[in-house]
Curated annotation (Swiss-Prot):
Listed cofactors: NADP(+)
PANTHER family in the record: ADP-L-GLYCERO-D-MANNO-HEPTOSE-6-EPIMERASE (PTHR43103:SF3), NUCLEOSIDE-DIPHOSPHATE-SUGAR EPIMERASE (PTHR43103)
Organism: Enterobacter sp. (strain 638)
Binding-site residues for substrate, renumbered to this chain: 169, 180, 187, 201-204, 209, 272
Assigned keywords, A-Z: Carbohydrate metabolism, Isomerase, NADP
GO terms of molecular function: ADP-glyceromanno-heptose 6-epimerase activity; NADP binding
Lineage: Bacteria, Pseudomonadati, Pseudomonadota, Gammaproteobacteria, Enterobacterales
Reaction(s) catalysed (UniProt annotation): ADP-D-glycero-beta-D-manno-heptose = ADP-L-glycero-beta-D-manno-heptose
CDD domains: ADP_GME_SDR_e
Entry protein name: ADP-L-glycero-D-manno-heptose-6-epimerase
Protein backbone atom coordinates (compact mmCIF):
# COMPACT_ATOMS: atom_id res chain seq x y z
CA UNK A 1 0.00 0.00 0.00
CA UNK A 2 1.02 3.59 -0.63
CA UNK A 3 -0.21 6.39 1.64
CA UNK A 4 -0.74 9.89 0.29
CA UNK A 5 -1.47 12.53 2.91
CA UNK A 6 -3.21 15.56 1.45
CA UNK A 7 -4.35 13.11 -1.21
CA UNK A 8 -7.52 15.06 -1.98
CA UNK A 9 -5.50 18.25 -2.39
CA UNK A 10 -3.74 19.72 -5.40
CA UNK A 11 -0.35 18.01 -5.56
CA UNK A 12 -1.44 14.92 -3.63
CA UNK A 13 -4.21 14.08 -6.09
CA UNK A 14 -1.83 14.56 -9.01
CA UNK A 15 0.61 12.10 -7.40
CA UNK A 16 -2.28 9.63 -7.14
CA UNK A 17 -3.07 10.22 -10.83
CA UNK A 18 0.57 9.47 -11.69
CA UNK A 19 0.47 6.30 -9.56
CA UNK A 20 -2.77 5.21 -11.24
CA UNK A 21 -1.14 5.76 -14.63
CA UNK A 22 1.46 3.18 -13.56
CA UNK A 23 -1.29 0.73 -12.58
CA UNK A 24 -0.98 1.40 -8.82
CA UNK A 25 -4.33 1.63 -7.02
CA UNK A 26 -3.62 0.21 -3.54
CA UNK A 27 -3.54 3.72 -2.11
CA UNK A 28 -4.74 5.09 1.23
CA UNK A 29 -5.73 8.75 1.00
CA UNK A 30 -5.37 10.77 4.19
CA UNK A 31 -6.98 14.19 4.19
CA UNK A 32 -9.49 16.52 5.79
CA UNK A 33 -12.65 16.75 3.71
CA UNK A 34 -14.26 19.48 5.81
CA UNK A 35 -14.03 21.39 2.53
CA UNK A 36 -16.22 18.89 0.72
CA UNK A 37 -15.45 20.35 -2.70
CA UNK A 38 -12.07 18.57 -2.63
CA UNK A 39 -13.82 15.24 -3.29
CA UNK A 40 -13.87 16.30 -6.96
CA UNK A 41 -10.10 15.74 -7.11
CA UNK A 42 -10.62 12.05 -6.35
CA UNK A 43 -13.68 11.06 -8.38
CA UNK A 44 -11.74 9.95 -11.46
CA UNK A 45 -8.96 8.28 -9.46
CA UNK A 46 -8.71 4.73 -8.12
CA UNK A 47 -7.85 4.34 -4.45
CA UNK A 48 -8.25 1.58 -1.86
CA UNK A 49 -9.26 3.57 1.22
CA UNK A 50 -9.71 7.00 2.80
CA UNK A 51 -8.96 8.17 6.34
CA UNK A 52 -9.37 11.51 8.08
CA UNK A 53 -6.05 13.18 8.92
CA UNK A 54 -6.77 13.31 12.66
CA UNK A 55 -7.76 9.63 12.83
CA UNK A 56 -4.60 8.76 10.89
CA UNK A 57 -2.43 10.70 13.34
CA UNK A 58 -4.05 8.99 16.34
CA UNK A 59 -3.44 5.53 14.85
CA UNK A 60 0.08 6.50 13.85
CA UNK A 61 0.99 7.73 17.33
CA UNK A 62 -0.53 4.61 18.88
CA UNK A 63 1.84 2.55 16.75
CA UNK A 64 -0.94 0.78 14.90
CA UNK A 65 -0.08 -1.10 11.73
CA UNK A 66 -1.48 -0.16 8.33
CA UNK A 67 -0.29 -3.30 6.57
CA UNK A 68 2.76 -3.30 4.33
CA UNK A 69 3.47 0.29 3.30
CA UNK A 70 5.68 0.87 0.26
CA UNK A 71 5.93 4.65 0.70
CA UNK A 72 4.30 7.68 2.28
CA UNK A 73 3.95 10.79 0.11
CA UNK A 74 3.34 13.50 2.70
CA UNK A 75 1.64 16.38 0.88
CA UNK A 76 -0.84 17.31 3.60
CA UNK A 77 -0.30 20.79 5.06
CA UNK A 78 -1.78 24.24 5.39
CA UNK A 79 -0.35 25.84 2.24
CA UNK A 80 -1.77 29.34 2.64
CA UNK A 81 1.01 31.94 2.64
CA UNK A 82 -1.48 34.49 4.03
CA UNK A 83 -2.40 32.42 7.13
CA UNK A 84 -0.88 34.03 10.22
CA UNK A 85 -2.16 31.68 12.97
CA UNK A 86 1.26 30.38 13.96
CA UNK A 87 0.02 27.69 16.34
CA UNK A 88 -2.28 26.23 13.69
CA UNK A 89 0.51 26.38 11.10
CA UNK A 90 3.11 24.71 13.31
CA UNK A 91 0.71 21.99 14.46
CA UNK A 92 -0.28 21.21 10.88
CA UNK A 93 2.99 21.61 9.04
CA UNK A 94 5.68 20.92 11.62
CA UNK A 95 4.47 18.69 14.46
CA UNK A 96 2.29 16.52 12.21
CA UNK A 97 5.16 16.05 9.76
CA UNK A 98 7.52 15.00 12.58
CA UNK A 99 5.09 12.27 13.67
CA UNK A 100 4.78 10.88 10.14
CA UNK A 101 8.56 11.05 9.64
CA UNK A 102 9.31 9.12 12.83
CA UNK A 103 6.74 6.46 11.97
CA UNK A 104 8.46 6.03 8.61
CA UNK A 105 11.91 5.83 10.19
CA UNK A 106 10.76 3.27 12.74
CA UNK A 107 9.25 1.07 10.02
CA UNK A 108 11.86 1.88 7.33
CA UNK A 109 9.23 3.30 4.98
CA UNK A 110 10.30 5.75 2.23
CA UNK A 111 9.12 9.24 3.24
CA UNK A 112 8.68 11.82 0.48
CA UNK A 113 7.40 15.18 1.64
CA UNK A 114 6.41 18.64 0.46
CA UNK A 115 8.72 21.48 1.38
CA UNK A 116 8.45 24.87 -0.32
CA UNK A 117 10.37 27.62 -2.07
CA UNK A 118 8.80 29.89 0.58
CA UNK A 119 11.77 28.80 2.72
CA UNK A 120 13.93 31.21 0.68
CA UNK A 121 11.94 34.34 1.52
CA UNK A 122 12.47 37.51 -0.48
CA UNK A 123 15.81 36.79 -2.11
CA UNK A 124 16.25 37.42 -5.84
CA UNK A 125 19.08 35.00 -6.59
CA UNK A 126 20.82 31.86 -5.30
CA UNK A 127 17.82 29.67 -4.50
CA UNK A 128 20.09 26.95 -3.18
CA UNK A 129 19.21 24.20 -0.68
CA UNK A 130 21.50 25.42 2.08
CA UNK A 131 20.93 27.23 5.39
CA UNK A 132 22.67 30.48 4.43
CA UNK A 133 20.15 31.10 1.63
CA UNK A 134 17.01 30.54 3.73
CA UNK A 135 15.03 33.34 5.37
CA UNK A 136 11.25 32.88 5.02
CA UNK A 137 8.91 35.88 4.91
CA UNK A 138 5.84 34.28 6.53
CA UNK A 139 4.91 31.65 9.10
CA UNK A 140 4.04 29.15 6.37
CA UNK A 141 7.56 29.41 4.98
CA UNK A 142 8.97 29.18 8.49
CA UNK A 143 7.04 25.97 9.25
CA UNK A 144 8.47 24.38 6.10
CA UNK A 145 11.97 25.69 6.79
CA UNK A 146 11.99 24.38 10.35
CA UNK A 147 10.92 20.90 9.25
CA UNK A 148 13.69 20.89 6.63
CA UNK A 149 16.14 21.81 9.39
CA UNK A 150 14.79 18.95 11.52
CA UNK A 151 15.20 16.53 8.60
CA UNK A 152 18.79 17.69 8.05
CA UNK A 153 19.67 16.54 11.57
CA UNK A 154 18.23 13.08 10.90
CA UNK A 155 19.34 12.42 7.31
CA UNK A 156 22.93 11.30 8.08
CA UNK A 157 21.72 8.49 10.38
CA UNK A 158 18.53 7.50 8.53
CA UNK A 159 18.19 3.87 7.40
CA UNK A 160 15.35 4.59 4.99
CA UNK A 161 14.63 7.16 2.30
CA UNK A 162 13.79 10.72 3.30
CA UNK A 163 13.32 13.24 0.52
CA UNK A 164 11.86 16.74 0.62
CA UNK A 165 10.87 18.79 -2.41
CA UNK A 166 10.92 22.56 -2.35
CA UNK A 167 8.00 23.23 -4.66
CA UNK A 168 8.23 26.50 -6.54
CA UNK A 169 5.11 27.98 -8.23
CA UNK A 170 3.10 24.89 -9.04
CA UNK A 171 0.07 25.16 -11.31
CA UNK A 172 -2.17 22.77 -13.19
CA UNK A 173 -5.17 20.43 -12.86
CA UNK A 174 -6.99 19.82 -9.56
CA UNK A 175 -6.28 23.14 -7.82
CA UNK A 176 -9.76 24.67 -8.12
CA UNK A 177 -10.58 24.08 -4.42
CA UNK A 178 -7.74 26.41 -3.37
CA UNK A 179 -9.79 29.55 -4.03
CA UNK A 180 -7.64 32.67 -3.76
CA UNK A 181 -4.50 30.51 -3.39
CA UNK A 182 -5.03 28.86 -6.79
CA UNK A 183 -2.60 29.83 -9.55
CA UNK A 184 -2.83 32.93 -11.70
CA UNK A 185 -3.51 30.66 -14.69
CA UNK A 186 -6.60 29.26 -12.94
CA UNK A 187 -7.97 32.72 -12.10
CA UNK A 188 -7.33 34.08 -15.59
CA UNK A 189 -9.21 31.16 -17.11
CA UNK A 190 -12.17 31.74 -14.77
CA UNK A 191 -12.29 35.44 -15.63
CA UNK A 192 -12.12 34.74 -19.37
CA UNK A 193 -14.89 32.14 -19.16
CA UNK A 194 -17.04 34.62 -17.23
CA UNK A 195 -16.68 37.14 -20.06
CA UNK A 196 -14.54 39.46 -17.92
CA UNK A 197 -11.37 41.24 -18.93
CA UNK A 198 -8.65 39.25 -17.13
CA UNK A 199 -6.71 41.13 -14.45
CA UNK A 200 -3.04 41.24 -13.50
CA UNK A 201 -1.18 43.34 -10.94
CA UNK A 202 0.62 46.36 -12.34
CA UNK A 203 4.24 45.47 -13.04
CA UNK A 204 3.47 41.83 -13.82
CA UNK A 205 5.96 41.80 -16.66
CA UNK A 206 8.60 42.39 -13.98
CA UNK A 207 7.34 39.83 -11.44
CA UNK A 208 9.02 36.57 -12.42
CA UNK A 209 8.50 33.19 -10.84
CA UNK A 210 9.59 29.65 -11.50
CA UNK A 211 6.25 28.25 -12.67
CA UNK A 212 6.30 24.44 -12.67
CA UNK A 213 3.55 22.23 -14.11
CA UNK A 214 2.02 19.84 -11.59
CA UNK A 215 2.41 16.85 -13.91
CA UNK A 216 6.16 17.43 -13.82
CA UNK A 217 6.05 17.68 -10.02
CA UNK A 218 4.29 14.31 -9.76
CA UNK A 219 6.80 12.75 -12.16
CA UNK A 220 9.73 13.92 -10.00
CA UNK A 221 8.11 12.49 -6.86
CA UNK A 222 7.69 9.08 -8.47
CA UNK A 223 11.20 9.06 -9.93
CA UNK A 224 12.78 9.72 -6.54
CA UNK A 225 10.67 7.02 -4.89
CA UNK A 226 11.62 4.51 -7.59
CA UNK A 227 15.30 5.43 -7.31
CA UNK A 228 15.56 5.68 -3.52
CA UNK A 229 17.42 9.00 -3.45
CA UNK A 230 17.39 11.00 -0.21
CA UNK A 231 17.93 14.71 0.45
CA UNK A 232 16.20 18.07 0.09
CA UNK A 233 15.76 19.26 -3.48
CA UNK A 234 14.40 22.28 -5.31
CA UNK A 235 11.52 21.35 -7.58
CA UNK A 236 11.02 23.98 -10.24
CA UNK A 237 11.99 24.32 -13.88
CA UNK A 238 15.17 26.33 -13.36
CA UNK A 239 13.58 29.16 -15.38
CA UNK A 240 11.97 32.39 -14.18
CA UNK A 241 9.06 33.51 -16.37
CA UNK A 242 6.79 36.50 -15.86
CA UNK A 243 3.16 36.60 -14.81
CA UNK A 244 2.69 38.38 -18.11
CA UNK A 245 3.88 35.21 -19.89
CA UNK A 246 1.22 33.20 -18.01
CA UNK A 247 -1.43 35.70 -19.08
CA UNK A 248 -0.21 35.66 -22.68
CA UNK A 249 -0.53 31.86 -22.79
CA UNK A 250 -4.04 31.96 -21.30
CA UNK A 251 -5.13 34.69 -23.73
CA UNK A 252 -3.68 32.75 -26.67
CA UNK A 253 -5.72 29.67 -25.74
CA UNK A 254 -8.93 31.72 -25.46
CA UNK A 255 -8.07 33.75 -28.59
CA UNK A 256 -8.33 37.04 -26.66
CA UNK A 257 -5.88 39.89 -26.36
CA UNK A 258 -7.01 42.40 -23.71
CA UNK A 259 -5.80 42.63 -20.10
CA UNK A 260 -6.59 44.99 -17.22
CA UNK A 261 -3.80 45.97 -14.83
CA UNK A 262 -4.78 46.60 -11.20
CA UNK A 263 -2.77 48.20 -8.34
CA UNK A 264 -0.55 45.94 -6.26
CA UNK A 265 -2.19 45.36 -2.80
CA UNK A 266 -0.58 47.19 0.12
CA UNK A 267 -1.00 44.14 2.40
CA UNK A 268 1.28 42.05 0.18
CA UNK A 269 4.14 44.54 -0.02
CA UNK A 270 7.22 43.15 1.72
CA UNK A 271 5.58 39.72 2.06
CA UNK A 272 5.62 38.78 -1.58
CA UNK A 273 8.23 36.88 -3.57
CA UNK A 274 8.77 39.05 -6.64
CA UNK A 275 11.27 36.62 -8.13
CA UNK A 276 11.92 32.89 -7.82
CA UNK A 277 14.12 30.59 -9.86
CA UNK A 278 15.05 27.11 -8.72
CA UNK A 279 18.69 26.14 -8.77
CA UNK A 280 18.47 22.58 -10.13
CA UNK A 281 22.12 21.64 -9.57
CA UNK A 282 21.32 19.14 -6.82
CA UNK A 283 18.23 17.72 -8.56
CA UNK A 284 20.21 17.07 -11.74
CA UNK A 285 23.19 15.68 -9.78
CA UNK A 286 20.80 13.20 -8.14
CA UNK A 287 20.08 11.81 -11.61
CA UNK A 288 16.79 13.41 -12.63
CA UNK A 289 17.38 14.49 -16.23
CA UNK A 290 13.91 14.92 -17.73
CA UNK A 291 12.86 18.32 -19.13
CA UNK A 292 10.24 20.57 -17.53
CA UNK A 293 7.40 22.20 -19.44
CA UNK A 294 7.72 25.91 -20.24
CA UNK A 295 4.92 28.27 -19.20
CA UNK A 296 3.64 28.32 -22.79
CA UNK A 297 3.51 24.50 -22.91
CA UNK A 298 2.14 23.96 -19.42
CA UNK A 299 -0.51 26.68 -19.48
CA UNK A 300 -1.76 25.49 -22.89
CA UNK A 301 -2.13 21.94 -21.53
CA UNK A 302 -3.79 23.24 -18.36
CA UNK A 303 -6.23 25.47 -20.27
CA UNK A 304 -7.24 22.48 -22.40
CA UNK A 305 -7.85 20.42 -19.24
CA UNK A 306 -9.82 23.18 -17.49
CA UNK A 307 -12.08 23.75 -20.46
CA UNK A 308 -12.67 20.03 -20.92
CA UNK A 309 -13.66 19.44 -17.30
Amino acid sequence: MIIVTGGAGFIGSNIIKALNDKGITDILVVDNLKDGTKFANLVDLNIADYMDKEDFLIQLMAGEEFGEIEAIFHEGACSSTTEWDGKYMMDNNYQYSKEVLHYCLEHEIPFLYASSAATYGGRTSDFIESREYEQPLNVYGYSKFLFDEYVRQILPEANSQIVGFRYFNVYGPREGHKGSMASVAFHLNTQLNNGETPKLFEGSDGFKRDFVYVGDVAAVNLWFWENGVSGIFNLGTGRAESFQAVADAALAFHKKDSLEYIPFPEKLKGRYQAFTQADLTNLRAAGYDKPFKTVAEGVAEYMAWLNRN
